[in-house]
Amino acid sequence: MQNFPPVEWAVSDAPVPYEAALAVMEARARAIREDGAPELVWFLEHPPLYTAGTSARIEDLKDPARFPVFEAGRGGQYTYHGPGQRVAYVMLDVAARGRDVRAFVAHLEAWIIQALAAFNVEGGMRDGRVGVWVDRTEPGGPPREDKIAAIGVRLKRWVSFHGISLNVEPELDHFTGITPCGIADPRYGVTSLADLGRIISMEEADIALKAAFQQVFASPLVRVDPPVTGSVPA
């Protein structure tokens, strides 16, 4: 496997406003593209909100007054972000990493799957359903799968931004204001590590995500100060 240069890694401890995060991502992606700035992986949480991807359908926003709604500009449909969910925004030079968008998304999925394995959770990829899923089928019952992590990225001149969100211990009821990722089939729901009985801290999730990223993307992570700090109202 080819090894790549170190990637900067930042962790924001307080919830970050979505618009502030979006501005940081766009500025950093532009700096990577135009000035050769270091790549960045940014771990954070948001206050409760919904984001709409480029394929979002208005009928999938079932409760528009519940939380603020933002146009994200990323691929995908509606998703929820909030406390207890680890968001990881990835600003990477995909051109230097092979110029293969499908392979890049597969790497993001593999990153999450490997991190979940640290907690004895078997995640998997599914054809036609981007993200990471876990089998929740009861013995003798009908097939059922729940989504534990979402993926939504955008590339501009081969530099990525947006990224992944892993449900550690969010309020799963907050997902009911949308049709998550546009999937209304009752066989497919949403879950979290806590819902699966894995009660872990965000710091423990970060350790697993860091180790998995370094292996899957073949880049060491170097800790830096977060680009945005400060809390926002929940």
Swiss-Prot record:
- Site feature Lowers pKa of active site Cys, where: K147
Which GO BP terms sit in this record? protein modification process
- Keywords linked to the UniProt accession: Acyltransferase, Cytoplasm, Transferase
Q: Where in the cell is it found?
A: Cytoplasm
Pathway per its UniProt entry is:
Protein modification; protein lipoylation via endogenous pathway; protein N(6)-(lipoyl)lysine from octanoyl-[acyl-carrier-protein]: step 1/2
* Catalytic activity line of the entry: octanoyl-[ACP] + L-lysyl-[protein] = N(6)-octanoyl-L-lysyl-[protein] + holo-[ACP] + H(+)
Q: Which InterPro entries match?
A: aa-tRNA-synth_II/BPL/LPL, BPL_LPL_catalytic, Octanoyltransferase, Octanoyltransferase_CS
Q: What is its main location?
A: cytoplasm
- Where substrate binds, per the record, is at R74, G75, G76, Q77, Y78, T79, Y80, H81, A150, I151, G152, G163, I164, S165
**One annotated Gene Ontology cellular component of this protein:** cytoplasm
Q: What is its EC number?
A: 2.3.1.181
Q: List the disulfide bonds.
A: none
**UniProt enzyme class:** transferase
The active-site annotation reads C181
Q: Which HAMAP family match?
A: LipB (MF_00013)
As for what it does, the entry says: Catalyzes the transfer of endogenously produced octanoic acid from octanoyl-acyl-carrier-protein onto the lipoyl domains of lipoate-dependent enzymes. Lipoyl-ACP can also act as a substrate although octanoyl-ACP is likely to be the physiological substrate.
What further fact does the record state? In the reaction, the free carboxyl group of octanoic acid is attached via an amide linkage to the epsilon-amino group of a specific lysine residue of lipoyl domains of lipoate-dependent enzymes.
What does the sequence similarity comment in the record state about its family?
Answer: Belongs to the LipB family.
Q: What is this protein called?
A: Octanoyltransferase
Q: What are the leading ranks of the lineage?
A: Bacteria, Pseudomonadati, Pseudomonadota, Alphaproteobacteria, Hyphomonadales
